[in-house]
Amino acid sequence: MNVSAVIVAAGRSTRMNKSLNKVYLSIAGKPVLYYSIKAFDEIEWIKEIIVVTSPEETEYCQENVLEKFYWNKPFKIVKGGEERQYSVYNGISVVDKDCEIVAIHDGARPLVTKEIIMEAIKAAYLYKAAAVGVPVKDTIKVADEDNFILDTPDRRYLWAIQTPQVFEKELIVKAHRKALEEGFLGTDDSVLVERMGFKVKLVEGDYKNIKITTPEDLVVAELFLRK
């Protein structure tokens, strides 16, 4: 297998009330981004890791994450765009020419495991597109603009989508280019593939695979890491 991992670390931390990007905040003595990369770095199938950063944080990432710790894989560091979707496109645009599969992961999800990543990669080889997620536990309501309930979808068919999301390289590149040409902005990568008429296979993940968004998430993540 020849897999490239794209780790997206170019987001803004507006809900953290901190000047430092959340992926560089510390959990158990190491940056959030360290843990997000580490699980991919330990997988034999993955041949390279591409880290997408904010333009103003490229040097900081290089010095405080990529050069500070020992890694097995070669790295590329790429500057991100104004939106996550553009950052992902910048990352997938520089994958190795021999790459068959691209695994895209949020740098703010430090609790992802090797096992989940590998299951998603295997699913992508079989189905061309796979996304990690978990069945929702709560009842979900669809509301109108005035916060009145319009509908209650059947919970049996609802999943909360996480990352990684893994795709055949040619498919995800085409999907991103199509979205760019048409001015479509999605909330994740799988929706871009869905727009092309492809089915995306769901791979059950872990409820612990949270995205660090608030200060409380840092506390929760550290508790899980120390277990």
Swiss-Prot record:
Phylogenetic lineage: Bacteria, Bacillati, Bacillota, Clostridia, Thermoanaerobacterales
Top-level taxon of the source organism: Bacteria
Claim: Lipid biosynthesis is one of the keywords in the record: no
Residues under site feature: Positions MEP for the nucleophilic attack: R155, K211
Catalytic reaction equation(s): 2-C-methyl-D-erythritol 4-phosphate + CTP + H(+) = 4-CDP-2-C-methyl-D-erythritol + diphosphate
Matches recorded under NCBIfam families: ispD
Described purpose of this protein according to its UniProt entry: Catalyzes the formation of 4-diphosphocytidyl-2-C-methyl-D-erythritol from CTP and 2-C-methyl-D-erythritol 4-phosphate (MEP).
EC number(s) stated in the UniProt entry for this protein: 2.7.7.60
Annotated site, Transition state stabilizer, chain positions: R15, K22
Example GO molecular function: 2-C-methyl-D-erythritol 4-phosphate cytidylyltransferase activity
Gene Ontology BP, a term: isopentenyl diphosphate biosynthetic process, methylerythritol 4-phosphate pathway
Pathway: Isoprenoid biosynthesis; isopentenyl diphosphate biosynthesis via DXP pathway; isopentenyl diphosphate from 1-deoxy-D-xylulose 5-phosphate: step 2/6
Similarity comment: Belongs to the IspD/TarI cytidylyltransferase family. IspD subfamily.
Keyword terms of this UniProt record: Isoprene biosynthesis, Nucleotidyltransferase, Transferase
Protein name: 2-C-methyl-D-erythritol 4-phosphate cytidylyltransferase
